[in-house]
């Protein structure tokens, strides 16, 4: 008796990964640069201050939406979005406005997004807020181990663009590159410098579609806002705060 034929092997269908569409630029975005946020500014500037480009050399507390305008700080659990956009706008009423995520900001403004964490792995009943800001240009200082290919991959741009930014010359540590790239960055409180990747290590093209699950799971998208690209202030108005306004353009 002949052997029974084996059933055909089933091929599992895989769902192709959807490419995240980049959001429109106003061309007034703050360039992505690590310094001074990565070193001297790491501890004194949280995600809110970073998103609106309000660098200060010293802060005695983290910046909170509504604090600058004098609203009570401790009223919100940050597990929901109610009232938060109004608090952000109240800090800079003529310099911030709400906008649909897919709509371009007007000239002189750039886009930020706000999310909150309804849950966390620590068992805390309070949540947290978090902000992202959009960029259209990268200012990058080359470091040991960099290649034109690795930089292109990191920022999701063609190799030829990085090669052109480098003048077509060999890699040199310390050399500064400037090139176009459309993505969002964020800063994890006082713990990190600027980050262009999400919790999965992927470049953030649209924060709404990024992995936002850290110790706090920032699963709730609140809104997008357009922020004036200069002169925005957040946090305490205490006289001890030393201001080092960055040149933004």
Regions found by a protein language model. Name each.
Residues 144, 159-176:
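Short acidic, glycine/serine/threonine-rich helix-capping segments at coil-helix boundaries
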């Amino acid at each position: 008796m002949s052997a029974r034929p084996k059933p055909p092997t089933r091929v599992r269908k895989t769902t192709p990964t959807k490419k995240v569409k980049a959001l429109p630029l106003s061309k007034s975005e703050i360039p992505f640069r690590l310094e001074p946020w990565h070193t001297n500014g790491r501890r004194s500037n949280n995600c809110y201050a970073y998103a609106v480009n309000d660098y200060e050399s010293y802060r005695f507390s983290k910046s909170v939406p509504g604090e600058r305008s004098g609203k009570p700080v401790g009223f919100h659990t940050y597990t929901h979005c109610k009232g938060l956009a109004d608090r952000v706008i109240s800090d800079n009423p003529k310099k911030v406005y709400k906008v649909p995520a897919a709509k371009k900001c007007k000239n002189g403004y750039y886009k930020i997004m706000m999310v909150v964490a309804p849950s966390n792995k620590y068992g805390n009943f309070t949540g947290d807020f978090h902000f992202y800001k959009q960029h259209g240009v990268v200012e990058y200082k080359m470091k040991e181990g960099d290649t034109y290919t690795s930089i292109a991959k990191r920022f999701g741009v063609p190799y030829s663009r990085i090669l052109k930014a480098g003048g077509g010359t060999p890699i040199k540590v310390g050399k500064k590159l400037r090139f176009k790239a459309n993505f969002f960055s964020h800063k994890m409180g006082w713990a990190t410098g600027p980050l262009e990747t999400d919790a999965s290590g992927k470049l953030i093209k649209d924060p709404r579609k990024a992995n936002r699950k850290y110790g706090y799971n920032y699963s709730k998208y609140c809104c997008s806002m357009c922020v004036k690209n200069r002169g925005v202030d957040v946090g305490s108005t205490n006289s001890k705060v030393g201001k080092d306004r960055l040149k933004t353009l």
